[in-house]
């Protein structure tokens, strides 16, 4: 039987309960799962902190670091091609079968790699939170953060 190998990508700036839910969902279904963590120096959150936060909930999850990602985003053909060339370098020879996300771009990633697209809580009905909202008001959204993430964000202010 074919081994089910999934992955997700994200900035995790900061890591929150919606991310945790997505990873938990994937781990239930996959034999192996990778989390691609993008470095985002412009957001002033170190990639090492993001990895620490994720591994505090999932010590055995496989992490792939994504440094110096292309700055061109979007769902237009050119942007997708640029992002996918970069992402393919990150995942390398890993024979992925499933892509997990809560975002519109999930279909583009899955189609490009010719793998299954798994959409998790896209409408944010289970956890109505986005990292950008947390960045804008940590106190208002702290209930969506684990203690370590909240503490680190408070210390960095």
Where are these regions (language model features)?
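Nucleotidyltransferase catalytic core that binds NTPs
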Residues: 1-157
């Amino acid at each position: 039987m074919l081994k089910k190998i999934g992955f997700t990508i994200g900035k995790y700036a900061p890591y929150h309960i919606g991310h945790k839910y997505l990873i938990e969902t994937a781990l239930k279904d996959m034999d192996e799962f990778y989390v691609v963590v993008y470095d985002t120096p412009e957001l002033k959150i170190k990639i090492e902190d993001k990895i620490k936060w994720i591994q505090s909930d999932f010590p055995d999850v496989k992490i792939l670091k994504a440094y110096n990602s292309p700055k061109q985003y979007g769902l237009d053909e050119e942007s997708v091609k640029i992002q996918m060339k970069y992402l393919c370098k990150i995942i390398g020879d890993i024979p992925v079968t499933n892509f997990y996300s809560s975002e519109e771009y999930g279909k583009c990633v899955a189609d490009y790699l010719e793998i299954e697209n798994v959409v998790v809580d896209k409408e944010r009905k289970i956890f109505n939170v986005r990292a950008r909202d947390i960045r804008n008001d940590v106190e208002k959204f702290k209930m969506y953060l684990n203690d370590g993430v909240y503490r680190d964000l408070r210390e960095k202010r």
